[in-house]
Swiss-Prot record:
Subunit-structure text: Binds DNA as a homodimer. Interacts with SRO9 and YDJ1. In the absence of heme, binds to at least four cellular proteins, including YDJ1 and SRO9, forming a high-molecular-weight complex (HMC) which results in repression of its activity and dictates its DNA-binding specificity.
Lineage: Eukaryota, Fungi, Dikarya, Ascomycota, Saccharomycotina
Name of the molecule in the record: Heme-responsive zinc finger transcription factor HAP1
Record's keyword terms, sorted: Activator, Coiled coil, DNA-binding, Heme, Iron, Metal-binding, Nucleus, Repeat, Transcription, Transcription regulation, Zinc
GO biological process: DNA-templated transcription
Bilayer-crossing regions: none
Region entry Heme-responsive, spans: 244-444
One Gene Ontology CC term in the entry: nucleus
Coiled-coil spans in chain: 105-134
Length: 1483
């Protein structure tokens, strides 16, 4: 760059230097400006021609970078010039630091630091006076205010320092000033209170009353996921924590899990009467008969001993005959010789773990060997590689082969006994959309040829030459690679800005010779000819002269893969129907010319044809980088490039989760997406952090002068630790010209000689290289800090890098002395780093109060309120991010050791824009950082075309979503804390409702932003161009969190209070025509009117909690739209499957029952044999697991707790699982935590009327198997009453069925209790061990004699209910009669004068021992008894869907869909020893 335009400014520099020296007496004096400049320049070169270097000064420009880029005159005003303000880029106005002004800057920093200390002392004094003036100040403990207390204890020292600098050293004057300040503050507080008393007197008094309330967040929102291979802690910010924090959801899960157990009992009774056939082979050999020669000497390869007597064989009338997958004609004399002496040790070559209990699926379900669906080993819960499509376990089969037969390739049957021809027909069949996730197949011919080469070497070791040859076939052509790199740095680079663009392109040019196609072009790719010969020029050789080049190759593969996935044409199509127009944002296509749009479309079409397969990354990281060894064994080869690859690898695993099936070997099949909730990311991030410590990234590079001498020698590899092999022709200089790599060896040696310092031009280039290396150093460190904060926020785990300034002094990237005039987009990256770090500091303040045990154990309400107010000011744009961070520090909410003091010289203009400005930026050419003035047309013409501006705004959009998600979480925590306190302290009802409304507003905001993102990702030149992969999971996760709160509110709106309002039985003695047709028609009419109103509902508006009866319907409409979205996204993203299952689960569960359809269909509609819910399919995978599987689900562990299986193992009585226990200790179980009885914030006076009408409309008769119906009774007896709280708390159990009343022979008598009603004493949890494996004989209610005898055995029940005219008083409905979730009755003697303390088991009755009578339960009767949850009438069909089927042998191991709750069915090591202990092992 020419220096001519700046020669006139030389005298001004000298004059400014002299004036600055005179102003700063502490600065070093200098005689001449030249001497001063040379003294401040790095002493790199001490040669004889030093005088020449002094005459050619290293001058720093005074104009701002933007004006120099636009080549206009700059007025040099601070903090931003007028030209940048007029053009609308004032936030980017940047001045390079002058070397002569360093000492003056230090003095200014000291003044700013003193000013901040004064403000901080005042704020702390105000906070402490507020705490001491509260009524609860006497009980205040030191650990309750760790930050404020510690800071105030040190405030004397700070105050003394302030007074010493201002000239007041007297302690008496210090105390006098402090008292005056306190008096002034008290006067201001009194004045503010009196001024606001008239407006909000009630809210202020309530807020002041409860400000010092303490919350314990260490127990209410913590989960421990117990797996077979360990435990995983999930903190308060994890998406599953809401399952534990909400009492309604906890009770609902308890009800569902107990229902699952009862349904298993029903299934067992149904299946226990079927005849077991153990002598028949489950394989139908008639379809594939063996040859005559083989039939005489060979046996079926299936081990028939594996089929025990307890496994059900296929019936004769099976419509789809099973065909043995083994072709018995293929077994020649040399294949699988029979072992006559060890016949019991023979193993079937068929991998039966792919099927259920050894039974082969029908032909239409046979997996195709050519399909991409991953095979799941349900016995081990591991994800097998997608290549193992053949059902034969080749590991067991090949070891019995002779070597010559195993290597034979002439006959396919000699390798595998499977007749693959019978399976080819199924390859063309379309896979179901909800089971198969389509993987993008490579479309180029070279890629298709690379897969067999990779598969042949997949299980064996590959040499480096073989790996490189395979990668050459997998990589796209050279021109396509250059286009991919340009697309990445243009669109995706701001999301992971840890590379130096020039340096990386130089590496790629050396490794792949990309510039050989067109040596005259400096930046490859964009200006190259588009001829077909250049497009198809393949990669023939990959040069890896250094160890770090392998990591650079891995980074390149990740860039190619991520960029291809992020092309807008590859994004998922989303059609939200009529609501699509509500979520559209203006695009920027109108600002581009038609030729630019056409050129962009051609480039994208070219890139779509060349996909880099994911196997290329697997080969590189396994054989070339050997990343597993580097990250776990040794750090000998760890350098800066290795850290960069590890960060890219982590970023790729989180973004492109569909590729994880071949990249990871996790055992986390319980989660739908192992890429986002897996603990493997925690381990990888910890490895990255340790690598950074090993490389010294936590220390600023200015602390190491030796970097100035070593970087030029190894500038191409910025942190190379050695050369893999001698290559003297390698150019080691960091040359920006692409043609440097094509020069001959003599020019390279000459360039190497130039490092001696004889050429001043090269010295300047080396100094620039040093600064760029230090810049990359700082960017990598702060990106790791941001990764740590994001992981802690996502998983609720503690941060690894706490109190950053205690061990790190690395400066922000803005401290780098780099001239950005040639790289404006790097200037945007630098400013983003500063802004995002400040936002991370705000997030850290929230995480400290929620996740840190020392703070979360006794966090106070006013601290959470302060965090809420500051975050609201930040996201609404009412306060600058610098002011927010300063307020957090002054209020003691953020310690300075976290890094707040590093931002003392931040640019106050560059802040977080408002969300509406971000979304509407493309409309009317609005300025992103407008200051309120109208912009003229001439200014718009001068506006600088900023690179990757849409990507930066998309990142701003994601920051807004994160901040508002935190606001939702904080309001939700306070809401769940104060809502149960309303029954004891009515003043908290106002607080609870305010927090609930705020939580709902922010939840709806996250819901809308999620819809906006996915509704605009396919629009051309939209805000989210090329961000569909990177931001998909964060946006969908926030939308999923929002829906969880919607479920909580729907439960409150439909269930009513937890005191048991309308907890009467829905089972009456009426006939099938007993429905009130007028009530039903009225309900249908009201529902139709509400649906018409919902069609007119604006999804962009907030929902009011005072909506009344329509609240549940409004929220349900949001759930249905989100379910529609996740169903469409499930075709592309694996993690959307889990969220679709979760949403469909609650939609199916909370859907209003259809009474007419249920009454017409009868009992057959509920039979589970061939029934499937029309909305959700295969929902009940996690609930169909066995006992061990459920006990390791964190939701089950929290809802029901652990139950020791001692009861099931003691004795062998058939009814031992249902016998009465003497005490809770004998069961070895723990109790549910006490839950307060209270009314929800959505409860209104109309809830009682609505629930009464619902209960009457839902009333149905009880049907017996013999069709007996009695129409003479209209009594409605409650089947489950909430227990009365004895001390203000009640252990509310899931309200299951206990007894339904029928009038038989003129008297009111109880029916035979269900199996689960006969359990332990009051308060014991229902145990999963009651599911027995023996045949159970129960009395048949259809036989009058047997039924009468069973009634005679129940004398305690008849003493209370024999009178037909007896009605239960209202006091009983209010909780005087207690019935736990197991069904045991316990009434209050003060209420009705009688007590039901015991219940006689049918086991001791005469009829129980009568084998001639057997009880056959009816499923419809069973479902109707258990469809009431705390007044919420759950659809019985939904119960069938969500609870699932019995684990009979026909369904063992089946898992057709991915679950949304983490489960595991293998015992964890170490816990099995505690199963028989006398103390509880949970909580």
């Amino acid at each position: 760059m020419s220096n001519t335009p700046y020669n006139s400014s030389v005298p001004s520099i000298a004059s400014m230097t002299q004036s600055s020296v005179s102003r700063s007496p502490n600065m070093h004096t200098a005689t001449t400006p030249g001497a001063n400049t040379s003294s401040n320049s790095p002493p790199l070169h001490m040669s004889s021609d030093s005088s020449k270097i002094k005459r050619k000064r290293n001058r720093i420009p005074l104009s701002c970078t933007i004006c120099r880029k636009r080549k206009v005159k700059c007025d040099k005003l601070r903090p931003h010039c007028q030209q940048c303000t007029k053009t609308g880029v004032a936030h980017l106005c940047h001045y390079m630091e002058q070397t002569w002004a360093e000492e003056a800057e230090k003095e200014l920093l000291k003044d700013n630091e003193l000013k901040k200390l004064r403000e901080r002392v005042k704020s702390l004094e105000k906070t402490l006076s507020k705490v001491h003036s509260s009524p609860s100040s006497n009980s205040l403990k030191s650990y309750n205010i760790p930050e404020s207390s510690n800071l105030f204890m040190g405030s004397d020292e700070h105050t003394t320092l302030v007074n010493a600098n201002t000239g007041s050293a007297s302690s008496a004057s210090h105390m006098h000033q402090q008292q005056q300040q306190q008096q002034q503050q008290e006067q201001q507080q009194d004045f503010s209170r009196s001024a606001n008393a008239n407006a909000n007197s009630s809210s202020l008094s309530i807020s002041n009353k409860y400000d010092n309330d303490e919350l314990d967040l260490t127990k209410d929102f913590d989960l421990l996921h117990i797996k077979s291979n360990g435990t995983i802690h999930l903190g308060a910010t994890h998406w599953l924590s809401i399952m534990k924090g909400d009492p309604y959801l906890k009770l609902l899960w308890g009800h569902i899990f107990a229902m699952r157990e009862k349904l298993n009992e029903w299934y067992y009774q149904k299946n226990s009467y079927s005849k077991l056939k153990s002598s028949k082979c489950p394989i139908n050999h008639a379809q594939a008969p063996p040859s005559a020669a083989a039939a005489a000497t060979r046996k079926c390869p299936v081990d028939h001993s594996a089929f025990s007597s307890g496994m059900v064989a296929p019936k004769e009338e099976t419509p789809l005959p099973r065909k043995c997958p083994v072709d018995h004609t293929m077994f020649s004399s040399g294949m699988i010789p029979p072992r006559e002496d060890t016949s019991s040790q023979k193993r079937c070559p068929v991998d039966h773990t792919m099927y259920s209990a050894g039974m082969m699926p029908p032909k239409d379900e046979t997996p195709s060997p050519f399909s991409t669906k991953a095979m799941i080993d349900h016995n081990k819960h591991t994800m097998n590689p997608p290549q193992s499509k053949c059902p034969v376990d080749h590991r067991n089969y090949m070891k019995d082969y002779p070597s010559d037969m195993a290597n034979s390739s002439s006959n396919p049957a000699s390798r595998c006994p499977i007749d693959h021809s019978s399976m080819k027909n199924t390859a063309a069949l379309p896979a179901s959309t909800h089971n198969t996730i389509p993987h993008h197949q490579p479309q180029s011919g070279s890629h298709a040829r690379s897969h067999p080469a990779q598969n042949r070497k997949h299980d064996s070791y590959m040499t480096e030459s073989e790996v490189l040859a395979t990668l050459c076939e997998m990589l796209p052509p050279k021109r396509v690679i250059a286009l991919f790199i340009e697309k990445f740095f243009k669109h995706l680079y701001p999301a992971i800005p840890i590379l130096d663009e020039q340096n990386f392109k130089n590496h790629m040019n050396q490794m792949l010779s990309l510039s050989s196609m067109n040596p005259t072009v400096n930046n490859f790719g964009m200006s190259m000819p588009s001829s077909s010969t250049l497009e198809n020029q393949p990669i023939t050789q990959i040069n890896l002269p250094k160890l770090s080049d392998s990591c650079n190759l891995g980074i390149l593969i990740i860039i190619l893969r991520l960029t291809w996935l992020s092309i807008p044409s590859n994004s998922c199509e989303v059609d939200l129907g009529e609501e699509s127009g509500s979520f559209l944002v203006p695009n920027e296509s109108s600002n581009m010319s038609a030729s630019a749009l056409t050129s962009m479309a051609k480039e994208e079409s070219l890139l779509l044809k060349h996909e880099t397969p994911v196997e290329a990354l697997e080969l590189c990281q396994k054989y070339l980088i050997k990343f597993d060894e580097l990250s776990s064994i040794s750090n000998n080869n760890v350098n800066l490039t290795t850290v960069q690859f590890a960060i890219f690898y982590n970023f790729y695993m989180k973004s492109a989760s569909n590729d994880l099936t071949t990249l990871t070997n996790t055992n986390n099949t319980g989660m739908a997406n192992p890429g986002h909730d897996s603990e493997s990311h925690q381990i990888l991030l910890s490895n990255i952090t340790q690598m950074a410590f090993s490389c010294g990234l936590h220390r600023d590079p200015d602390n190491f002068p030796q970097l100035n001498a070593t970087i030029p020698a190894t500038s191409q590899d910025v942190s190379n630790n050695g050369s893999k092999k001698a290559n003297p022709s390698t150019n080691p200089t960091l040359n920006n010209n692409m043609s440097a790599a094509t020069t001959n060896s003599s020019s390279r040696s000459g360039s190497a000689d130039s490092r001696s310092g004889s050429n001043p031009v090269n010295k300047k280039e080396n100094q620039v290289s040093i600064e760029r290396f230090k810049h990359t150093w700082r960017k990598i460190w702060y990106y790791i800090v941001s990764m740590d904060v994001n992981q802690s926020l996502s998983l609720g785990s503690p941060r690894l890098l706490r109190n950053l300034r205690d061990f790190s002094d690395t400066k922000l990237p803005s401290a780098s002395r780099i001239d950005y005039v040639r790289d404006i987009k790097e200037l945007i990256i630098v400013k983003n780093f500063t802004l995002f770090f400040q936002i991370d500091l705000c997030i850290i303040a929230v995480l400290n109060h929620i996740l840190n045990v020392s703070l979360a154990r006794s966090v106070r309400k006013f601290e959470l309120d302060s965090l809420i107010n500051l975050l609201k000011n930040l996201t609404y744009g009412t306060e600058n991010v610098n002011d927010v961070v300063s307020s957090l520090i002054n209020k003691g909410l953020l310690p300075t050791s976290e890094g707040g003091s590093v931002d003392s010289n931040n640019d106050e203009i560059y802040g977080l824009p408002k969300l509406p400005d971000i979304l509407n930026h493309g409309q009317h050419n609005q300025n992103l950082y407008a200051d309120g003035r109208n912009t003229s047309s001439s200014d718009i013409d001068k506006k600088l075309d900023l690179p990757h501006e849409s990507t930066t705004r998309a990142l701003f959009f994601s920051k807004h979503m994160t901040i508002r998600m935190l606001l939702y979480l904080l309001n939700y925590i306070l809401f769940t804390h104060y809502e149960p306190m309303g029954s004891e302290d009515p003043g908290t009802n106002i607080l609870a409702k305010e927090y609930a409304q705020e939580a709902l507003n922010f939840a709806m905001d996250g819901y809308r932003n999620c819809m906006i993102f996915f509704n605009n990702i396919r629009n051309t030149n939209s805000l989210f161009d090329y961000m569909n992969v990177i931001l998909s999971y964060p946006c969908l996760d926030i939308g999923h969190r929002s829906l969880q709160f919607i479920v909580c509110l729907i439960l409150r709106a439909k269930c009513g209070p937890l005191t048991g309002m309308r907890e009467s039985s829905i089972i009456t003695n009426g006939t099938s025509s007993g429905f009130n047709s007028s009530v039903e028609d009225e309900d249908v009419k009201v529902k139709q009117e509400s649906s018409d109103e919902l069609k007119k509902d604006d999804f962009m508006k907030d929902v009011n909690l005072d909506s009344g009866d329509s609240l549940a319907e409004i929220l349900m409409s949001r759930m249905l739209l989100f379910q529609k979205l996740t169903k469409q996204l499930s075709k592309k993203y694996n993690y959307a499957i889990r969220m679709n299952k979760s949403t469909g689960f609650f939609v199916s569960l909370l859907d209003t029952p259809s009474k007419k359809s249920d009454s017409k269909s009868g009992g057959s509609s509920f039979m589970l044999g061939n029934w499937k819910h029309p909305k959700v399919s295969n929902m009940s995978g996690f609930l169909a697991g066995d006992k061990d599987q459920l006990q390791k689900c964190p939701v089950y562990q929290d809802a029901l707790g652990f139950v020791s299986p001692t009861g099931a193992n003691e004795g062998s009585a058939p009814m031992q699982g249902m016998s009465l226990q003497g005490s809770t200790a004998r069961m070895g179980g723990t109790q549910l935590p006490p839950i307060r009885s209270y009314k929800p914030i959505t409860y209104t006076s109309s809830n009682l009327r609505r629930m009464n009408e619902t209960g009457e409309a839902e009333a149905k008769r009880r049907r017996f198997n013999d069709g007996y119906i009695d129409n003479n009774s209209n009594n409605d007896i409650p089947r489950g009453i909430s227990p009365k709280p004895s001390n203000g708390l009640s252990s509310v159990q899931p309200l299951l069925s206990s007894f339904s009343m029928n009038q038989l022979n003129g008297g009111t008598i109880p029916t035979v209790p269900s199996l689960t009603n006969i359990t332990s004493q009051m308060g014991a949890l229902p145990s999963l061990d009651r599911i027995t494996t023996n045949q159970i004989n129960l009395p048949d209610p259809s036989r009058d004699e047997a039924f009468d005898n069973s009634i005679k055995q129940m004398t305690p029940m008849t003493s209370a209910f024999m009178n037909a005219n007896t009605t239960i008083p209202s006091s009983t409905l209010n909780g005087n009669m207690n019935m736990n979730g197991a069904g045991t009755a316990n009434t209050d003697t003060s209420a009705n004068g009688s007590a039901l303390s015991t219940l006689t088991s049918p086991q001791g009755s005469d009829l129980a021992s009568n084998s001639a009578t057997q009880y056959k339960p009816d499923l419809e009767d069973f479902l109707m008894q258990n469809s009431n949850f705390n007044g919420l009438m759950i659809n019985p069909s939904s119960l069938v869907e969500v609870v699932g089927g019995y684990n009979d042998p026909n369904n063992l191991g089946r898992n057709d869909a991915v679950d949304f709750l983490p489960v595991d069915n293998v015992e964890i090591d170490g816990l099995v020893d505690f199963y028989r202990a006398d103390f509880p092992i949970w909580e």
